[in-house]
Amino acid sequence: QTMYYSTLNQKNFNPDDFRAIKFVIQGGSQPLPSIQQAFKKYGINIINGYGLTEAPLVMVNTPENARHKPMSIGKSVMFVDAKVLDEDKNEVGDGEIGELAIRSKNVTPGYWGQPEETKKSFHNQYFLTGDLAKKDEDGDIYIIDRKKELIITGGENVLPSEVENALAEHPLIDRCVVVGYEHPKYGESIAAAIILREKVPDYVEQLDKHMRERLAGYKVPRMYLPVTHMPLNSTQKPDKLVIREMMNSKVNKESSSEANHNA
């Protein structure tokens, strides 16, 4: 995803240089629909693959299937068995969201020297990936989000990817990452780190209106943090831990400033 953003935003980006390319395969994180659509304008399909450090290449979509289901990671490759499980480790129905679990010879037998971590990462020989997913009636699988990144605000579950997808549709947004931050009343609230294409004074009002037209009120970010560069981790993915710390720090500073003002 980081590479696709960078490619599109290069000043010397020329679509003619990519005329011979019909599709590219990506993994690591799922591109936003806006990125898929941007590449499709140039006749390039982004095909999603899926794998983990614990299980290299588990699934990959096909060029033909990607035309109709661009956000799918396709079906399991040969000798890989995949299920989508609920919290009680029961398989969910088509279209329902649960945790993706896989069983195969290429799955790690466990974590070296960490028996407890190994034990909680497996269920009946299936490795629990930590990724929320759903399966359609054709057996194609879609990654929804990381389970641990689910935001619970006032008892409501919010998928960061859903908020990011809606936010990315606004013409002001060049890039966005959504996280939960500590909130005294709701436990967590929603914040977005954003890179703006253009600096305008009323960007918060514009984004808030845009989001409320697309999502339920509890899914709308309560805070926006403009940044010039998105923090990335060692694998060049957005570093949500750092971004979350930035949000909490911003809230604490604002609370401290307000307390001093009222003193």
Stretches with model-predicted labels:
Residues 28, 51, 74, 89, ...:
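Active-site glycine-centered loops adjacent to acidic/histidine catalytic or metal-binding residues
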Residues 23-26, 178, 225-226:
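Hydrophobic/anchoring residues in structured secondary elements
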Residues 245-263:
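Acidic/polar alpha-helix N-cap and adjacent early helical turns
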Residues 4-68, 81:
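Gly/Ser/Thr-rich phosphate-binding loop
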Residues 71-77, 91, 121-125:
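Short Gly/Pro-enriched turn/cap motifs at secondary-structure boundaries
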Residues 47-54, 74-75, 179-182, 225:
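Beta-strand->loop->alpha-helix junctions that form or flank phosphate-binding loops
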